[in-house]
């Protein structure tokens, strides 16, 4: 089986870190040991610097919505071209904490940036490059933000309004309904059930990949 790019998506507090551990365990059970992890924004020295600016902002200078999305795509193209594509080319599997769907949901849905602009940015920056599988962890924003607050201080985006996260979630669900490579898992369930659902999704998907 050729190397694959698997992405975990979801709102704050959805449990992406736990989900990534579950995915790694499952892949290793199938004999896939050669893999790396990425996160967005971030994953390269330049992209990590952009991550800090996006997450925390700059004191005294509001970050405009368009500047935010352009910084995200700058970080993304650095990661894809310098890390993800080379890894896949040498036979390494890549498990990513967020990818382009986050921008489509957060900036396109949450910020309300024009859909045509978001599509144009994606196509210009990424071309036809897409994850092989995206697991979207869905849960009500109220639950996710409560979990996020329990982790500690919230960043600039996590401090957004509930309406912002409602719009973001709606855009996630919209994309998931349209794209067969995006599988939705109910992340409001107990963690054991979420893990079991992820196992099932991966088991079925890996069988499909093995059977061609």
UniProtKB/Swiss-Prot annotation:
EC number per UniProt: 2.7.4.9
Where are the coiled-coil regions? Answer: none
Catalytic activity entry: dTMP + ATP = dTDP + ADP
Indicate yes or no for the key word Lipid metabolism. no
Residue numbers binding ATP: 10-17
Kindly list the GO CC terms recorded for this protein: cytosol
Q: Where are the transmembrane segments?
A: none
GO biological process entries: dTDP biosynthetic process; dTTP biosynthetic process; dUDP biosynthetic process
Per the record, the similarity remark reads: Belongs to the thymidylate kinase family.
* HAMAP family reported in the protein's UniProt record: Thymidylate_kinase
PANTHER family named in the record:
THYMIDYLATE KINASE, UMP-CMP KINASE 2, MITOCHONDRIAL
- Write down what this protein is called: Thymidylate kinase
Q: Which organism is it from?
A: Photorhabdus laumondii subsp. laumondii (strain DSM 15139 / CIP 105565 / TT01) (Photorhabdus luminescens subsp. laumondii)
Q: Quick one: which gene encodes this?
A: tmk
């Amino acid at each position: 089986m050729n190397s694959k790019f698997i992405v975990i998506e979801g709102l704050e507090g959805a449990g992406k870190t736990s989900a990534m551990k579950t995915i790694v365990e499952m892949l290793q059970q199938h004999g896939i040991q050669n893999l790396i992890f990425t996160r967005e924004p971030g994953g390269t020295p330049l992209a990590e610097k952009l991550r800090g600016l996006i997450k925390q902002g700059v004191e005294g200078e509001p970050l405009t919505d368009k500047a935010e999305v352009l910084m995200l795509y700058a970080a993304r193209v650095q990661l894809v071209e310098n890390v993800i594509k080379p890894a896949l080319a040498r036979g390494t599997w890549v498990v990513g904490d967020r990818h382009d769907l986050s921008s489509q949901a957060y900036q396109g849905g949450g910020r309300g940036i024009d859909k045509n602009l978001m599509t144009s940015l994606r196509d210009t920056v990424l071309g036809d490059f897409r994850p092989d599988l995206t697991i979207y962890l869905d849960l009500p924003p109220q639950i996710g933000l409560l979990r996020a607050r329990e982790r500690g201080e919230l960043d600039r985006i996590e401090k957004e309004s509930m309406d912002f996260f409602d719009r973001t979630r709606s855009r996630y669900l919209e994309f998931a309904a349209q794209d067969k490579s995006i599988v939705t898992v109910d992340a409001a369930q107990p963690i054991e059930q979420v893990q079991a659902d992820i196992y099932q999704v991966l088991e079925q998907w890996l069988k499909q990949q093995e059977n061609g």
